[in-house]
Amino acid sequence: VLLNKKESIMTLQKSLEKEFVTKGYTIDNPKIIKDPYKASPLTALILFKTKTKVSPKVTIKGKDINTTFTHNFKNSKEHYLEIYGLYPDKENEIEIEYKENDQVVKKAIKIKTDKLPSDLHLPTKIFADKTKLSNELYFFTPAVKGYSVAYDVNGDVRWYLTNKAVWDNTRLKNGHLLVGTERLIYKPYYVTGLYEIDMFGKVYKEYSLPGGYHHDYFEMPNGNLLVASNDFHNSSGTVEDIVVEVDRNTGKIIKTFDLKNVLNMKDGVSENSTSYDWFHNNSVWYDRDTNSITLSGRHMDAVINIDYKTSKLNWIIGDSTNWSKEYQKYFFKSIGENFEWQWRQHAAMITPKKDVFIFDNGNNKSKIKEKYVPAEKSYSRGVLYKINKEDMTIRQVWQYGKERSSSFYSSYISDVDYLDKNHYIVHSGGIVKGDLKSSNYPAGLTKGKVSLMSDTVEILNNEVIFEIVLPTNNYRVEKMPLYTDTNLSLNNFKKLGTLGKTKVNKEKIGILNSNKNLDNIIKKYDIKLLNEEDRLVFSGRFKKNNKVNVILYKNFV
């Protein structure tokens, strides 16, 4: 059958939740559902009832105190205990404890899990000073292919999603995660929007955007979402130069920031600049105190800050070479020793002290081709800048990575996180080598025998207290606790926003002749039709620039 229909998220989740019953189950005979939403294999749901209201405490036993998790559940007679952080391919030990009628009740439960997928990557190196670490996990998202995975301080996998979830993976104020959908809207990597999920992988909301989602988002103080998006129908044919504010409750776009109205598209040209991807925004950060938005333009080697209310440009961090005269006043003048500009940066953020924290990928280290530094002599850094907007000066106050030379060099992606004063994560997520030599390009563009790596370092008071090396590229990493105060809700899934409408050519085509070789054509071009809840997806393999017409009848179902 050419046409396949995809089951809706609501239908699938409602079907699974029919099994979530507590009636007839007690602490001595609880119901245990492994991976209840078929999306997060290292989780389980334990269900039972008690005669009186009790507050169960659950302990998932680890190898040591840094890998053992405890969570207290709310007072109730009906119990839906979320079990997270199970080890793969192991009989896990879980202890449930509560007090009822002045009696302490304890119950030990064992849950056996399956093996990890063969293509899920395990660490090749782990260093952990456990005296300075908690039991929080390190949540990684894939560069392109792969899994969203959380590792503990021993490097063991304690959580992962089977559904593809790309780009950022940050916890919202309500305790849920916000991840990119698996649904492609436009090549090469733009997806339809965002899913709000819990640790089971249950989807509570889907936010769809006409311009899709890429790279980053930010949860504003009022709960709305600032999302890196596109306008696929703009007259300039550009991408990655739009940021939208999405109403959290309705999914409607209530404000649009178009960077074509802020910057000159021909300024600040770097090696990676193209006419359509001139800015390449890869991070979004909102600062309440200044009511401003900080964005990272990789292809301009520039971090910019704009006014939220007016969209006017406030300042630019970066080398001002190749920028027109009218923009020079927005650049900072460097002061102090050992200062270096950032190049092809990612993950720009504003710290509580109003410093600017950036992952400096370090590509070329110049805008002038004759001065380009080759990959084998390049290095990437997490760098902290202190800016003075009164006299427009900038000082480099901290960095990590230069001392690691090209072994820590990521030509693309990567991340930094501010955890607390003098406490940071620097994630070099795009280390690529071709024939053992550092590459300036992602894996698909690197020649020779390609090897991939990500190297993530946690630093406290200038001392490395944790490091994890993985044999793959990872987009970002977030250090987060396994549990929050948010418990499972059986509320229905909400679909918010819109993908817009596809332009239709109303030209009359005429009579369509049946083709006896239709099956061969479908096979030759790998043609597929997928009927989703909000769109019909046509896919196939054709020669570049070939025109393909998709003709639908009015009575098509």
Where are the predicted features?
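Histidine-/acidic-rich catalytic cores in large beta-rich domains
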Residues: 4-14, 18-56, 60, 78-80, ...
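Short beta-strand segments within Ig-like beta-sandwich modules, predominantly Fibronectin type-III
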Residues: 70-76
